[in-house]
Design a protein with these regions (language model features):
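N-terminal secretory signal peptides that target proteins for export/translocation
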Residues: 1-16
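Intrinsically disordered, low-complexity segments
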Residues: 1-2, 23, 93
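Extended rod-forming repeat segments used as scaffolds/tethers
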Residues: 12, 16-17, 26, 352
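Short, surface-exposed loop and linker segments with low hydrophobicity and enrichment for Pro/Ser/Thr
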Residues: 21-22, 208
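Bacterial N-terminal signal peptides
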Residues: 22-32
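Residue-level hotspots at or immediately adjacent to binding/recognition sites across diverse folds
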Residues: 35-353
Length: 353
């Protein structure tokens, strides 16, 4: 059983109706993969991915699942996480040092290139979930999550500092284009910015209270945020001002399926910019790319069987030349200079480009 990743109305917060991604519902999805190492076809729901090279990537998902590929997704192996909670985000500072975050304030770390993963003592209460992270270097990491959760380490994970907000706001994404400049995005149009390496954070108005699920800054000045209702925002002045962009959502081919009204404004869940290359992923198979620094976005139509699949995570190499995207039911796509090849996990086919 694959659970929907659609938006759900949840509790009210400060008089504002809250809309959240259905991350909580993932715990009832059925996992059919065996634990332990071994080559396999991935069928699990996947939420986070990290591209290490054009051929190597890591992905995380349901029930503590960690996957690794060294051949651009033709084959994948599992790694033991030591937990069964869903894992939402993964990042590496270098080839050896990486971190994973997940449900119940879970933080896992590796110092041997992912061969082994060990839990770290989280300062975030277990009733909060951690959704995203950024490993700036082997010593400095930022994580964000539920109920305003923010935490950081400056000693490689030996100790963590709780920097959570007082506000009841879910934080979904964090981006650091360099060690000094960082940005955090979340619900109700929340956008936080730092210019001093995270010592202080200030709110930046984005002109909307719509939930932002993804944020990515290519430079300290140029950034993008994505969210509900197909929202794409762009800033050219470090988040001081934002403009709405209109992405090319792939909905026309879905009209015959009878879902057009529902699919007109799908949630967009992640964005990555690197150089002139960029990728946005979201509900109902929406995958958009740019090759001109985000001036224009092109919809990449997926094969028919994947057109209703939600896509949750995307990662690009620093030069934007390659990357990976992941989503529901083991969806994996390899990205090669803006061209999409999928599925990445052994059933490769051109994505209608």
């Amino acid at each position: 059983m694959v659970c929907s990743h659609r938006l759900l109305e949840d509790r009210h917060a400060g008089g504002r109706r809250r809309q959240v991604a259905a991350l909580a519902s993932i715990v009832v999805a059925v996992l059919t993969l065996p634990a332990g190492a071994g080559t396999l076809a991935v069928k699990d729901n996947l939420y986070g991915v990290k591209a290490m090279s054009a051929s190597e990537a890591w992905a995380v998902g349901n029930f503590g699942s960690i996957y690794h590929t060294a051949d651009a997704g033709k084959t994948w192996e599992t790694r033991d996480s030591g937990t069964k909670v869903p894992l939402f985000g993964i990042d590496f500072a270098d080839a050896e040092h990486g971190w994973i975050v997940g449900k119940s304030s879970t933080i896992l770390a590796t110092a041997d290139g992912g061969k082994t993963w060990k839990p770290e003592k989280s300062v975030i209460p277990p009733e909060k979930h951690l959704f995203n992270l950024k490993a700036i270097d082997a010593r400095t990491v930022w994580v964000v999550g539920d109920w305003g959760a923010i935490a950081t380490t400056h000693d490689g994970g030996a100790t963590w500092e709780d920097r959570s907000l007082a506000d009841d706001v879910v934080l979904y994404a964090v981006s650091f284009p360099d060690p000094q400049h960082g940005f955090i995005a979340g619900e109700f149009g929340t956008l936080l910015a730092t210019a001093d390496g995270g010592r202080t954070w200030e709110k930046r108005p984005v002109g909307t209270e719509k939930t932002l699920f993804g944020v990515s800054f290519a430079t300290p000045e140029k950034g993008w945020a994505v969210g509900i209702d197909g929202l794409i925002l762009r800033t050219r002045d470090a988040g001081q001002t934002w403009e709405v962009q209109h992405g090319a959502l792939a909905i026309e081919s879905l009209e015959e399926l009878g879902f057009l009204e529902t699919l007109k404004n799908p949630g967009l869940y992640d964005v990555r910019m690197a150089g002139q290359q960029g990728v946005v992923v979201g509900d109902t198979g929406n995958l958009m790319t740019t090759a001109d620094g985000g001036e224009t976005w092109t919809a990449r139509e997926l094969p028919e069987k994947q057109r209703l699949v939600w896509l949750r995570g995307v990662s690009l190499l620093p030069d934007g030349s390659a990357g990976f995207a992941v989503g529901a039911g083991g969806f994996m796509a390899a990205i090669d200079h803006g061209q999409i090849v999928l599925p990445a996990n052994g059933r490769r086919a051109a994505a209608g480009l």
